[in-house]
């Protein structure tokens, strides 16, 4: 009877992975009392085959889930319509509640029938036995056997806790349950006294901004968190997970962040290969509709690196909602997991981000300054210009206030706090992070990210002449035009390198540098062009084109 109840309440099983010979336990090693033998690919098909009763009951419950999601998103309009028609009176609500209660009872009955169907299936009984054994005892053998199954991630046991590192238990400087530290925007009116009257005046605007951010704004910014989109992408995500596990020997893990969100991760270890880049770990930060199953992790994987991918809060197996604070909390536990559980030193970690993933990448580089390098692909400096691009001009004040208070993705500000090597990849046909049209390459916000980085690190070089010539170089729409501008100013790379190395040897590596202070205008132009070319590479493609492995290059450093 207990097993039947477990089948009724158990998670949905999607797939049974092919077990690799290298992962099977040696015959000489005795099993623990709670260990259960996992199925081999020779006995069962790798795709879970539900019985007819479970299959039909699952279809009914999945349809009910879709209808509930549609009802949730349309509820404001539905309530408004019902109110206008007078259907929200007590005489109308009571019968409706009876219908809703009856429907819930019917769905509970369908769930019980699904449980009976699972109970009669030896594949599911084997799986639920392993899952229960792992929850009782998270031994390496039990976790190895559980990794052979792909199921609803909510039931996956937690593999790593944000407080697990001993240094955080002893130190009071780490993150609290409220979250890690973020850079906050400065008040808009610094000279105005923050009196009670001013607070009351601002209250309607603050309430409006909060409602916009938590309804329309968050879903527009992170469409991958919308349940209906995830439901449509589920077959593709399952195929992507199967490829990472079966072909790349990936290991899935659940991390618990300081805010209570559970973060879905996938780790591919290449340290045992002959390729030297396998000793480096690339932590990948996906875009606003990207998932590690089908996202930018493929680029460093093809290049031979060890890779750690993770999903934003609210994406696929990760819980929560993707607001900046939750995003930073998730990134924090991912980096801690890489260092304290996977055993990588910060000097062996590379942060790689695509598009909106630049926020968590720059936060990690700012908070963990010892990481080896950072690569930002198709990213931007600040969210406000891009948000204003897609909203009406009459909403400018509301949009700016909402972004600054609730969705402040200040990539450039965080990037300037990082002292290590940085490479920016600008897509010359980008249709997402341009503020006008894709053909207008100067409206690409990657330009502003580069300029802010160089102006912070080399303020004397990027004054007047240097800034002007870098803008000319950024206007080039082809490699031929770039080379023409570079050769026009007769940039001597050996001279530029010697100047920078001499300054570093005398003053140290910490930015900002005052190099160029006593330099001629021609020298500043040469140095500015040299630095711009080293920090930004062009890729002739649109925003969502996968980055080829040959374009995944380590950033330049002295």
Swiss-Prot record:
Pfam families: ABHD16_N, Abhydrolase_1. InterPro entries: AB_hydrolase_1, AB_hydrolase_fold, ABHD16_N. The chain crosses the membrane at residues 60-80, 93-113. It is an enzyme of class 3 (hydrolase). Keywords: Disease variant, Hereditary spastic paraplegia, Hydrolase, Lipid metabolism, Membrane, Neurodegeneration, Transmembrane, Transmembrane helix. GO terms for biological process: monoacylglycerol catabolic process; phosphatidylserine catabolic process; prostaglandin catabolic process. It catalyses: 1-heptadecanoyl-2-(5Z,8Z,11Z,14Z-eicosatetraenoyl)-sn-glycero-3-phosphoserine + H2O = 1-heptadecanoyl-sn-glycero-3-phosphoserine + (5Z,8Z,11Z,14Z)-eicosatetraenoate + H(+); 1-hexadecanoyl-2-(9Z-octadecenoyl)-sn-glycero-3-phospho-L-serine + H2O = 1-hexadecanoyl-sn-glycero-3-phospho-L-serine + (9Z)-octadecenoate + H(+); 1-octadecanoyl-2-(9Z,12Z-octadecadienoyl)-sn-glycero-3-phosphoserine + H2O = 1-octadecanoyl-sn-glycero-3-phosphoserine + (9Z,12Z)-octadecadienoate + H(+); 1-heptadecanoyl-2-(5Z,8Z,11Z,14Z-eicosatetraenoyl)-sn-glycero-3-phosphocholine + H2O = 1-heptadecanoyl-sn-glycero-3-phosphocholine + (5Z,8Z,11Z,14Z)-eicosatetraenoate + H(+). It comes from the Eukaryota. GO terms for cellular component: membrane. Changing residue 457 to Q: In SPG86; no protein detected in homozygous patient cells; increased levels of phosphatidylserine and decreased levels of lysophosphatidylserine in homozygous patient cells, indicating loss of function in phosphatidylserine catabolism. One of its GO terms (molecular function) is monoacylglycerol lipase activity. It is a multi-pass membrane protein. Optimum pH is 7.2-8.0. Its EC number is 3.1.-.-, 3.1.1.23. Phosphatidylserine (PS) lipase that mediates the hydrolysis of phosphatidylserine to generate lysophosphatidylserine (LPS). LPS constitutes a class of signaling lipids that regulates immunological and neurological processes. Has no activity towards diacylglycerol, triacylglycerol or lysophosphatidylserine lipase. Also has monoacylglycerol lipase activity, with preference for 1-(9Z,12Z-octadecadienoyl)-glycerol (1-LG) and 2-glyceryl-15-deoxy-Delta(12,14)-prostaglandin J2 (15d-PGJ(2)-G). It is linked to Spastic paraplegia 86, autosomal recessive: A form of spastic paraplegia, a neurodegenerative disorder characterized by a slow, gradual, progressive weakness and spasticity of the lower limbs. Rate of progression and the severity of symptoms are quite variable. Initial symptoms may include difficulty with balance, weakness and stiffness in the legs, muscle spasms, and dragging the toes when walking. In some forms of the disorder, bladder symptoms (such as incontinence) may appear, or the weakness and stiffness may spread to other parts of the body. PANTHER family: ALPHA/BETA HYDROLASE DOMAIN-CONTAINING PROTEIN, PHOSPHATIDYLSERINE LIPASE ABHD16A. Belongs to the AB hydrolase superfamily. ABHD16 family. This is Phosphatidylserine lipase ABHD16A. It comes from Homo sapiens. The gene is ABHD16A.
């Amino acid at each position: 009877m207990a097993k039947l109840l477990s089948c009724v309440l158990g998670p949905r099983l999607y797939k049974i992975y092919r077990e690799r010979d290298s992962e099977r336990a040696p015959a000489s090693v005795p099993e623990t009392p709670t260990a259960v033998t996992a199925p081999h690919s020779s006995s069962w098909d790798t795709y879970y085959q539900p019985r007819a009763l479970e299959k039909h009951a699952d279809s009914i419950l999945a349809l009910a889930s879709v209808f509930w999601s549609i009802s949730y998103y349309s509820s404001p309009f539905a309530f408004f319509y019902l109110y206008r028609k007078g259907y929200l009176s007590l005489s109308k609500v009571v019968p409706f509640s009876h219908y809703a209660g009856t429907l819930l009872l019917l769905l509970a009955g369908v769930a019980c029938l699904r449980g009976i169907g699972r109970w009669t299936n030896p594949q599911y009984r084997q799986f639920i036995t392993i899952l229960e054994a792992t929850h009782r005892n998270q031994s390496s053998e039990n976790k190895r056997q559980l990794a052979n199954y792909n199921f609803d991630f909510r039931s996956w046991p937690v593999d790593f806790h944000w407080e697990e590192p001993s240094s955080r238990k002893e130190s009071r400087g780490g993150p609290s349950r409220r979250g890690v530290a973020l850079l906050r925007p400065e008040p808009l009116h610094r000279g105005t006294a923050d009196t009670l009257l001013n607070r009351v005046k601002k209250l309607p605007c603050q309430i409006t901004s909060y409602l916009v951010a938590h309804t329309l704004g968050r879903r527009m910014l992170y469409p991958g968190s919308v349940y209906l989109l995830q439901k449509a992408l589920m077959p593709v995500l399952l195929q992507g997970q199967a490829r990472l596990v079966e072909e790349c020997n990936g290991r899935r893990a659940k991390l618990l962040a300081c805010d209570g969100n559970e973060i879905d991760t996938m780790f591919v270890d290449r340290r045992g290969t002959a390729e030297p880049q396998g000793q480096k770990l690339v932590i990948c930060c996906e875009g606003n509709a990207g998932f590690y199953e089908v996202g930018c992790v493929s680029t460093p994987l093809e290049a031979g690196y060890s890779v750690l991918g993770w999903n934003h809060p609210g994406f696929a197996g990760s819980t929560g909602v993707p607001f900046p604070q939750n995003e930073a909390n998730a990134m924090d536990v991912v980096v801690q997991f890489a260092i304290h559980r996977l055993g990588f030193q910060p000097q062996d970690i590379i942060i790689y981000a695509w598009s909106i993933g630049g926020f968590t990448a720059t936060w990690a580089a700012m908070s963990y300054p010892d990481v080896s390098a950072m690569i930002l692909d198709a990213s931007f400096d600040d969210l406000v210009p891009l948000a204003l691009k897609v909203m009406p001009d009459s909403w400018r004040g509301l949009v700016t206030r909402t972004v600054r208070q609730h969705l402040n993705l200040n990539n450039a500000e965080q990037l300037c706090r990082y002292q290590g090597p940085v490479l920016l990849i600008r897509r010359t046909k980008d249709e997402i992070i341009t503020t006008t049209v894709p053909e207008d390459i100067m409206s690409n916000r990657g330009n502003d990210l580069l300029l802010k980085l160089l102006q912070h690190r080399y303020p004397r070089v990027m004054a007047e002449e240097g800034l002007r010539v870098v803008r000319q170089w950024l206007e080039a729409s082809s490699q031929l035009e770039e080379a023409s501008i570079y050769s026009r100013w007769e940039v001597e790379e050996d001279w530029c390198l010697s100047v920078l190395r001499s300054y570093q040897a005398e003053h140290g590596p910490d930015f900002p540098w005052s190099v160029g202070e006593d330099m001629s205008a021609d020298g500043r132009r040469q140095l500015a062009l040299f630095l711009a070319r080293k920090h930004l590479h062009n890729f002739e493609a649109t925003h969502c084109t996968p980055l080829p492995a040959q374009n995944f290059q380590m950033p330049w450093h002295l």
